[in-house]
């Protein structure tokens, strides 16, 4: 039996802090969606000031999806409980074992993708394995990154990728456990109708539909474990509030929007955070907002417990996991 002990490190954030936390990856996503030639004329991504974003950015239909992907990645890295718990359970469905949930951006189709690929190479080790779900030994992930990037540029033709992971170039993230260095290819779609399965992809991350079930499930037709991000009063709702702040701020030429464009007091507070920093580079603003964001919430410890059977004890896992509150006793002699 698996026992997972989660200890809360920090109190749950207020609305302003929660929105601020998600604004950061949205800004990152917009910055990296800028075309390379536009960025070069502005002095490189490190030099793009926040006030320049409205003029450099060309809004597109895929912007929300790109930023949702970055927000999911960031939430996993921050230990956002609603997201990390879902990812942990989805990985368990894929039989990926470990204690430390992690996320690595890949996104070969994004502008600035070479930097993302280079970053992924740094984060991975020679022992990092990709669990594709097919029979046979897991493949070493790092050695296939370059082939995956090349496959995107050729739309999958003559990629050099093994057949079992021939669709890896379509991955947006690698989700897994950093302590066991085990990863799975993951596709992220803000529109669930756009979710498709390919060899090498194991998990599909989508927003849960408002008011409907958000349970993790296996889709046999797509050969994907579907991992809906929670909506009502949770991650997806916060994402859309943060997206509203950023788009309204950019439409107002990097100033605080009119109240009719952003009527919620919490949202206007975050917009003021941005307006106060409009003369600074976007990368520095993202870093500065970190101090105002929701900090990491949970510390997770996982262990296996033996089962007492009639006739003896066994370490064979019969039950996947048990979830229950851990009591604390303040000022108690117990």
Residues covered by each model-derived region:
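Active-site beta-strand-loop-beta-strand hairpin of nuclease catalytic cores
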Residues: 165-167, 174-186
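Catalytic cores of nucleic-acid endonucleases
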Residues: 136-142, 150-153, 159-168, 188-266
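Acidic-basic catalytic patches of nuclease active cores, encompassing PD-(D/E)XK
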Residues: 48-157
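Alpha-helix boundary/N-cap detector
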Residues: 22, 63, 67, 71, ...
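Non-catalytic C-terminal interaction segments of nucleic acid-processing enzymes
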Residues: 251-334
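Nuclease-adjacent, charged terminal/linker segments that flank catalytic cores
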Residues: 1-97, 310-314, 318-334
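Hydrophobic transmembrane signal anchors and adjacent membrane-proximal interface regions, especially
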Residues: 3, 36, 50, 85-89, ...
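Polar/charged alpha-helical tracts
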Residues: 14-21, 25-32, 37-40, 89, ...
């Amino acid at each position: 039996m698996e026992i997972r002990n989660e200890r809360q490190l920090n109190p749950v954030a207020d609305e302003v802090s929660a929105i601020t936390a998600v604004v950061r990856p949205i800004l990152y996503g917009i910055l990296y969606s800028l075309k390379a030639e536009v960025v070069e004329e502005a002095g490189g991504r490190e030099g793009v000031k926040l006030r320049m974003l409205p003029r450099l950015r060309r809004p597109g239909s895929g912007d929300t999806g790109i930023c949702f992907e970055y927000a999911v990645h960031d939430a996993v890295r921050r230990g956002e409980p609603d997201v990390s718990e879902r990812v942990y359970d989805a990985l368990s469905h894929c039989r990926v074992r470990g204690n430390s949930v992690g996320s690595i951006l890949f996104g070969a189709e994004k502008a600035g993708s070479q930097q993302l690929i280079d970053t992924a190479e740094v984060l991975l080790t020679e022992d990092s394995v990709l669990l594709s779900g097919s029979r046979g030994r897991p493949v070493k992930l790092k050695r296939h990154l370059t082939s995956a990037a090349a496959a995107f540029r050729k739309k999958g033709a003559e990629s050099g990728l093994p057949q079992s992971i021939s669709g890896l170039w379509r991955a947006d993230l690698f989700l897994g456990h950093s302590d066991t260095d085990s990863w799975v290819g993951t596709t992220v779609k803000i529109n669930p109708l756009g979710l498709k399965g390919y060899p090498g992809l194991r998990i599909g991350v989508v927003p849960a539909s408002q008011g409907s079930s958000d349970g993790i499930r296996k889709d046999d037709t797509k050969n994907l474990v579907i991992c809906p991000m929670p909506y009502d009063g949770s991650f997806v709702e916060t994402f859309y509030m943060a997206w509203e702040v950023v788009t309204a701020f950019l439409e107002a030429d990097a100033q605080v929007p009119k109240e009719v464009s952003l009527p919620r007091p919490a949202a206007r507070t975050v917009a003021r955070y941005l307006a106060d920093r409009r003369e600074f580079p976007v990368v520095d603003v993202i870093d500065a907002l970190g101090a105002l964001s929701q900090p990491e919430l949970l510390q997770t410890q996982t262990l296996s417990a033996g089962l007492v059977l009639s006739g003896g004890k066994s370490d064979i896992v019969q039950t996947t996991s048990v979830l229950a509150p851990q009591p604390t006793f303040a000022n108690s002699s117990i």
